[in-house]
A protein has these predicted regions:
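N-terminal amphipathic, basic-rich helices that act as targeting or association modules
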Residues: 2-170, 437, 507-524, 535
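Non-catalytic terminal/interface segments that mediate subunit docking, oligomerization
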Residues: 79, 83-105, 126, 144, ...
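Cofactor-binding active-site loop characterized by glycine-rich and histidine/acidic residues
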Residues: 84, 89-101, 105-115, 122-265, ...
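Acidic, glycine-rich active-site loops and adjacent beta-strand->loop/helix elements
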Residues: 157-161, 185, 245-252, 275-280, ...
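Short secondary-structure boundary/capping segments
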Residues: 168-172, 257-262, 286-296, 313-316, ...
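A glycine-rich helix N-cap at a beta->alpha junction
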Residues: 172-184, 264-275, 300-304, 628-646
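Active-site phosphate/pyrophosphate-binding segments
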Residues: 191, 490-496, 504, 632-684
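Long, well-ordered, tryptophan-enriched scaffold segments
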Residues: 276-503
Length: 684
């Protein structure tokens, strides 16, 4: 045993909590950190990583699990104060504008409720996401210009009143329209509940409800943009996909189940912003755990860059004096259910539960009064912390980024709503609450106007309005926005398909006829480049493997191996400029690719023609919600269900027998359905 080993503190389980042992152990850890700092100072970052990897391998080889340690960082902001950039805007002015938007968003729902028609609406979600949305819209999310492709903003669906409220201030929506929230058939028009492009085609780029659709569609929008660039159809002028999501909807399998492709294909044009207000519709997201830590591990393990925004600036002085990480350890151990409890507790009660019997932590917390402790901000309401996170995410290279932002559901709505389990269902307020909130937000309305939830608009020449317009002009225009200018294609003459329309002298399957048509169209100089074959790992089933060598399978990294069938007439050919989207066994991802390709006329000004070919039973029945979303997004393309019928695949069992897809498809209003039996019907 070496001399240094003799000095390492050793304790049994019943001694490890003693004050003496804890002091010795903190000193030991401090020495290790100092040693690591010395390595960092003397060598490069690469050597530090190599050393840590060696230590990790040592621990694993001795049966010590490190899964939590390697995938989770402490429960604090990822970006320390020392690396925080200066804020480029006027926080006081931006807060005034945000308060006006908050009031009008709330007023929309209150006015709808006051009609007594049971229209519904949601107030609490936007209340929690308002600051992060405003920081993004004032400083980051760019519109399309001559030199920039433009960003796509996909919002958390329940926060739509806030986006409508901002568009109203910007002059993009009339007072009649926002006054008719959820009443679209009124004489002067109205607004749909959530982002529906078919209902408001000038505003919403993509449908983000129902929950779960936003994540998967945003991933595949980002991926399709890279696809277009790698095929030389879209110039590399930038453009990011910003997806704002809720922590509750991250449980949707369509979201978490598709995040791997984003890191695998290095989608650095994709940013997820997860609003971690710790609550879903009925109660806590993870009352017995920590949703931010859970999501960090999931995304970090999938190869994403993870940025956490948990604490506001008021915590920075406390971190500075937390030399022994006493406060940090308390932050790490408190559960989300307890953090939610803090949001509805007095400062005195918070302090008692937070400090318990820890004298050192109590000493740190004496720097805050009970009132200050009650009002201290979470990171999601701190402009500076949000700006730092968005700034780093927007500069990411080679990886997608997820920003996990801690907020409070119902923030600013008073003690009757903030952090309460009923916050999501809050649709009205008492007269006293309305007046109190208006006063707190600084809205200059009379008591009667507050009670009636009157909309408030500053003078067009006011400082607030000038600032808001100026910030959007700097970023190229207003957001969110959907474009309709695109290049059109002329349909090929029918005589190009004479091989099929004139009849064939022998019986062939309609699937074979379809593959031959696709092969012919891919060779057409006018429409061939715009064709996007999409296959969920069923190309050989449908006899489409011959297209592999003709069109190539898209892979952003090309093909760095020799396929086992390299010497055959239809080798598995992957290429950076490949045309076929081989989605693997992921129908949700395939439909998301179909949506991205079929709406390329809007987001990329290209008339792409997606043709998604699948086992018919795994179409409408498997991803019907995504198909409906494609209709809402006004997607243009062809869905081809192969091997249909109740008897076609009898041996496969009832889960493969399809006699009802057309019944399911018939309820999608803008989806035309056919059941072709002959090759000429496919051609026509």
């Amino acid at each position: 045993m070496t001399e240094s080993q003799k000095n390492i503190p050793v304790a049994s389980d019943d001694q490890s909590d003693s004050h003496e042992f804890q002091n010795e152990w903190r000193m030991e850890m401090h020495e290790w950190v100092e040693s690591l700092q010395a390595v960092k100072d003397s060598y490069s970052e690469r050597e530090v990583k190599e050393l840590l990897r060696e230590l990790q391998n040592f621990a694993l080889s001795h049966g010590i699990s490190l899964s939590e340690a390697t995938l989770n960082t402490p429960y604090r902001n990822t970006i320390p104060l020392s690396e925080q950039p200066s804020y480029p805007g006027d926080i006081e002015m931006e807060s005034k504008i945000e308060n006006i938007i908050r009031w009008n968003a709330m007023a929309m729902v209150l006015q709808a409720y006051d009609l007594g028609e049971g229209l519904g609406g949601h107030i609490a979600t936007y209340a929690s996401t308002a600051t992060m949305t405003e920081v993004a819209l004032n400083h980051f999310i760019k519109s399309r210009t001559e030199n920039y492709q433009g960003d796509m903003l996909n919002i958390q669906a329940h926060s739509s009143p806030g986006i409508y409220s901002r568009a109203f201030l910007e002059g993009r929506l009339s007072i009649e329209e926002i006054g008719n929230f959820r009443r679209e058939l009124q004489k002067d028009g109205g607004l749909p509940s959530y982002p529906h492009p078919r209902r408001r085609p000038e505003l919403w780029p993509s449908p983000t409800a129902s929950m779960g659709l936003n994540g998967v569609s945003s991933i595949y929008y980002a991926r399709f943009s890279k696809y277009l660039e790698n095929r030389g159809l879209l110039s590399k002028k930038g453009g990011k996909i910003w997806a704002f999501l809720g922590d509750g909807e991250m449980d949707e399998p369509e979201t978490i189940g598709t995040i791997n492709i984003a890191s695998r294909e290095k989608l650095d044009n994709l940013i997820f912003v997860v609003n971690c207000n710790l609550q879903r519709l009925d109660g806590p997201v993870r009352g017995n755990g920590k949703i931010i830590q859970e999501l960090e591990a999931v995304f970090r393990g999938s190869g994403w860059d993870v940025i956490k925004v948990i604490w506001g600036s008021e915590w920075d002085p406390l971190f500075a004096i937390d030399q022994n990480d006493v406060m940090q350890r308390r932050m790490d151990e408190v559960l989300d259910g307890e953090y939610q409890m803090y949001s509805v507790s007095s400062g005195e009660d918070q302090r008692a539960h937070w400090v318990k019997d820890n004298n050192e932590l109590e000493s740190i917390m004496t720097n805050l009064s009970n009132d200050e402790l009650k009002d201290i901000k979470r990171g999601g309401f701190d402009h500076k912390k949000l700006y730092a996170a968005f700034d780093r995410a927007s500069k990411s290279s080679g990886k997608p980024t997820v920003i996990l932002v801690k907020t409070l559901k119902g923030y600013g709505l008073g003690e009757g709503s903030e952090g309460r389990n009923i916050a999501h269902q809050k649709k009205t307020m008492s007269d006293e609450e309305r007046v109190e909130i208006a006063e707190r937000l600084g809205i200059p309305l009379s008591k009667e106007e507050c009670i009636s939830a009157k909309f408030y608009v500053p003078d067009q020449d006011s400082e607030e309005m000038r600032y808001m317009h100026k910030m959007r002009q700097k970023l190229g225009g207003y957001q969110p926005v959907r474009h309709e200018e695109y290049k059109s294609l002329k349909a090929p003459d029918l005589n190009q398909f004479s091989d099929f329309t004139d009849g064939i002298d022998r019986s062939i399957s309609t699937t074979l006829a379809l593959v031959r048509m696709m092969s012919k169209m891919l060779r057409d100089e006018k429409i061939g480049p715009y064709l996007v074959p999409i296959i969920p790992d069923e190309a050989r089933t449908f006899g489409m493997d011959g297209l592999f060598s003709q069109a190539g399978i898209y892979s952003p990294s090309g093909q760095n191996y020799e396929p086992v069938d390299a010497g055959t007439i239809s080798p598995y050919k992957e290429a950076k400029d490949g045309q076929i989207l081989q989605e693997g066994i992921c129908e949700a991802g395939a439909l998301a690719s179909f949506m991205a390709a079929g709406t390329a006329y809007s987001h990329s000004e290209l008339p792409m023609i997606p043709i998604y070919i699948f086992y018919s039973i795994f179409g409408m029945q498997r991803v019907g919600d995504m198909v409906w979303a494609c209709g809402d997004a006004m997607t243009k393309g062809f869905l081809i269900g192969g091997t249909a019928g109740r008897t076609t695949l009898n041996g496969e069992g009832v889960q493969h027998q399809d006699g009802h897809s057309h019944v399911l498809a018939s309820v999608v209003p803008n989806m035309m359905t056919y059941d072709p039996a002959f090759a000429y019907e496919l051609a026509v």
